[in-house]
Amino acid sequence: MNLDFIKSKIAAVPDFPKPGIMFRDITPLLADPQGLRKTAEAMAQELKNKGIQPTIVAGTESRGFIFGVALAEVLGLGFVPVRKPGKLPRATYSVKYDLEYGSDSLEIHQDAFKVTDEVLVVDDLLATGGTAKATVDLIEKTQAKVAGLIFVMELDGLGGREVLAGYNVSALIKF
């Protein structure tokens, strides 16, 4: 896999967005002509190693769109966007979830998946797991099955894996 390459393209930005936070910036990875493809290929290899065989990919707005579409292309699968409220034109399911300060919501079209679908959730970062769990809850409202979740990076020690206990969770890089 290309994990050393991927990790080398993620910039550490201290004290952003506030003092004491080490922000992991993916823009250098995306700016590299090989960055997105190598990341998607590494994700595909991780899925193969774990025996995860999704039938469709879902990505959470907004960076999950970037990596989700790239991975769907590598896997030869379709892609479904999980959106912020009010962005989808047809009937939707909605899930509200808590953030550090306040709450947010995510939506998905009610007909986004077939009951037989094995959905892979893709996003750039697993931290507390709130957004990922909301995405899982939306998928389960459609009666589809969650095949697994995969992230470019995981911030260890923030409880994301615990929130997603019972699901197959992978991250290419841990910080």
Curated annotation (Swiss-Prot):
GO CC terms of this entry: cytoplasm
Chief site of localization: cytoplasm
Job of this protein: Catalyzes a salvage reaction resulting in the formation of AMP, that is energically less costly than de novo synthesis.
Any one Gene Ontology BP term: adenine salvage
Source superkingdom: Bacteria
Name of the protein in question: Adenine phosphoribosyltransferase
Subcellular location: Cytoplasm
HAMAP family: Aden_phosphoribosyltr (MF_00004)
Organism (species): Francisella tularensis subsp. tularensis (strain SCHU S4 / Schu 4)
InterPro entries (alphabetical): Ade_phspho_trans (IPR005764), PRibTrfase_dom (IPR000836), PRTase-like (IPR029057), UPRTase/APRTase (IPR050054)
Gene3D superfamilies: 3.40.50.2020
PROSITE patterns: PUR_PYR_PR_TRANSFER (PS00103)
Phylogenetic placement of the source organism: Bacteria, Pseudomonadati, Pseudomonadota, Gammaproteobacteria, Thiotrichales
Key word Transferase present: yes
PANTHER family: ADENINE PHOSPHORIBOSYLTRANSFERASE
